[in-house]
Amino acid sequence: MQEYHIHNLDCPDCAAKLERDLNKLDYVKKAQINFSTSKLFLDTSDFEKVKAFIKQNEPHLSLSFKEAAEKPLSFTPLIATIAVFLGAILILHLEPSPFIEKAVFVVLALVYLISGKDVILGAFRGLRKGQFFDENALMLIATIAAFCVGAYEESVSIMVFYSAGEFLQILAIARSKKSLKALVDVAPNLAYLKKGDTLVSVAPEDLRINDIVVVKVGEKVPVDGVVIKGESLLDERALSGESMPVNVSERSKVLGGSLNLKAVLEIQVEKLYKDSSIAKVVDLVQQATNEKSETEKFITKFSRYYTPSVLFIALMIAVLPPLFSMGSFDEWIYRGLVALMVSCPCALVISVPLGYFGGVGAASRKGILMKGVHVLEVLTQTKSIAFDKTGTLTKGVFKVVDIVPQNGHSKEEVLHYASCSQLLSTHPIALSIQKACEEMLKDDKHQHDIKNYEELSGMGVKAQCHTDLIIAGNEKMLDQFHIAHSPSPENGTIVHVAFNQTYIGYIVISDEIKDDAIECLRDLKAQGIENFCILSGDRKSATESIARTLGCEYHASLLPEEKTSVFKTFKERYKAPAIFVGDGINDAPTLASADVGIGMGKGSELSKQSADIVITNDSLSSLVKVLAIAKKTKSIIWQNILFALGIKAVFIVLGLMGVASLWEAVFGDVGVTLLALANSMRTMRA
C-alpha cells in the first residue's frame, strides 16, 4: 500500500467516516487512516479519483507524498470573538433598551456565524451526504432550536464555547500527534558519503554496502556499519532505551539512528537503510500505530450507535412530557437540547487510540518495540510465561571448559573437527567452539575446505571437509546417524563429535544465568504472573540446573516442533493467554504461535520477525516494564471510557430534570474530550 500524508485532519470521527467511505469505492482495494499520525495507507487503481473524492467530500483536507510544514495555530480570532460576545452581553444587561437589544441581536448573529462557520459548513456537507447524525449537523440543530425557544444568548454561547473547545481540542491533538510523530522521526534524514577527499550529502536510502560515510558530532549514524576510523561515544537510547552512552572505536559495530556525541567517525556501511536497525524501529512503531485494539474496534462500533441513541433520547425528552401535560414544549425542548449536546462520542474516539499509541511510545523509549497495540491488551490478561533457556534466561556467552577425546583421538582433533563443522553457524555454542579453536590451535586452514553444510534444527550440524563427513551435535544427532557413543557427564552442555561415522569425543560447554533473571521472575510474580516454565532444546541436566535456581518447571531436549507442542499444552492448562520469550531460530515457531511472542534483541532475525514484541536492549527487566506499561495503559483507557460515559449520562439526567443549562452541557461534550485527551497523554509517561 502507498503511504500519503493527510493535511488538516483534526477530527477522529471524520477520519473514521472517511475511511469507511473510501473502502466502499470500487477503485479502492483497501484504505486505512492513522489519525494519530495523519497518514493514509491506500491500495487503489486510480489515485486521482481518490483525490477528487476527498476534495469533494472533505474540501478542507488534502493529500501529499511529503509532510507539509506545520502551520502555527493562532489564538487571536478566538480571543477576539469571545471578547465581542462577552462585551455584547455585558452592554445588553447594563444598558437595556429596544435599540441596544436590536444592535446586540445583530452582533450576536454575526458572532454566531463567525464562530460557527466551520460547524455550519460541515453540517451542510454532512447533510448533503445524508449524514444526519454528524456532530456538526447536531450542533447546528441544537443552536437553531435554542434560537426558536428564545434562548438567544445561550444559543450563541454554545457555538462560541463549542468552537473554543474545538480549537483547544485541535491544539491538544496536534501536541499529542507531535509526541507520537517523534517516535517515527528518530531516523536520520541525511548522510555524508565520502568520495575521495570530498563529502557528498545523500539520503540514507541511497547508501550502498561498503560505502564510507562520515558522521559528525551531534549527528546520527545513518545506517548499520562498522567504525573504520575514529573513537567516540554514541547515544543509542532511540534503539535500546539505554541512556548510558556507548564507547566505540575502530572495528566497533554501530547501529543506524545512534547519536554521535564526542568525535568524528568514519563508518563503512554493512546494511542497506531498509535493513538497518533504525528502519526496523520506525517500521515497527508505524505498524503498531496503524493497528486497532479490540477496545478501539468496540468504541468505533459503539460510537456509530451512541449518537443516534442519544438523539432519540433527546427527542423523547423534548416531545413526550408536553404531550402528557407535564409542561410547555419550550421548556422540554430546552431540556432535550441539553441532552443533545452530549451526543458526540469524540471523548472516546480520540482518547482510546491515543492512549494505546502513548503506551506503544512509552515502551519504544525503553527499548521495547511492539508490532501492534493489541499486544497491550493481551499482556494484561496473561498469567503464564514460558522461556527459552539459552540466550534468554542465560547470557548465551558460552565457553569451552573441557574436551574429552574417545577412540584414540586427541583433544586437538576433536576441537579441530568440531570447529570445522560449525564454521558456517552463528549459534552461540558454535561461536564458542570456533573461538576455542583459534585460541588453542592457531589454525584456520580448514576454513577453505567446508562444503555440503547442513543444520538440523534442535540437534546439530553436519558438514563435509574434503571427502570426510563431520557430525557435531547432541545425542539425538548421533542417534539420527546411528553413531555409537559412550555416556557423557551430566553437567554442562555437551557437543558430541563424529568423524566419518566414528565417535571421536565430546566438548563440554558452560553458560551462565543472566544477572537479572532471578529478580525478573520475582518482579513478574509481583505483577500477577503465576506460572513459569522453561522450554529448552538443551539436555536435561543443563536445563534442570537453571530451572532449580529460578524455581520453575522445565522441559528439556525439545525439538522446535516439540517446543511448540509443549507450549500449547502449557497454555491450555491455565486457560488464559500465555507469553513465550525466546531468541533463537528454533524459537520462531513457538513465538509465532504464542498469544504474545517476545523476541530478545540479540537473538536471530527470524525470531524477531516471528515475535509480537522485540526487546532491543536484551534485558529481562524489560519484561517487567512492558507489563507495567500495559497495565497502566489499560487503566487509563478505562478511566477515560467510564469518565466520559459517566459525565455524559449525568448531563442527560440533569437535562431531563431541568437542572443543567445549555452552555454547561458544552462541558459535557468538549470539556470531557479535553480531559480525556489529557489523561490519555499520561500513557506516554508510563
Curated annotation (Swiss-Prot):
It catalyses: Zn(2+)(in) + ATP + H2O = Zn(2+)(out) + ADP + phosphate + H(+); Cd(2+)(in) + ATP + H2O = Cd(2+)(out) + ADP + phosphate + H(+). The keyword Cell membrane applies. GO terms for molecular function: ATP binding; ATP hydrolysis activity; metal ion binding; P-type cadmium transporter activity; P-type zinc transporter activity. Cd(2+) binds at C11, C14. Residues 93-102, 152-154, 328-332, 658-665 are extracellular. It is an enzyme of class 7 (translocase). Residues 1-62 form the HMA domain. Zn(2+) binds at C11, C14. The chain crosses the membrane at residues 73-92, 103-124, 132-151, 155-174, 309-327, 333-350, 636-657, 666-681. The active site is at D388. Residues 1-72, 125-131, 175-308, 351-635, 682-686 are cytoplasmic. It holds the Pfam family Hydrolase. Belongs to the cation transport ATPase (P-type) (TC 3.A.3) family. Type IB subfamily. PANTHER family: CADMIUM/ZINC-TRANSPORTING ATPASE HMA2-RELATED, CADMIUM_ZINC-TRANSPORTING ATPASE HMA4-RELATED. This is Cadmium, zinc and cobalt-transporting ATPase.
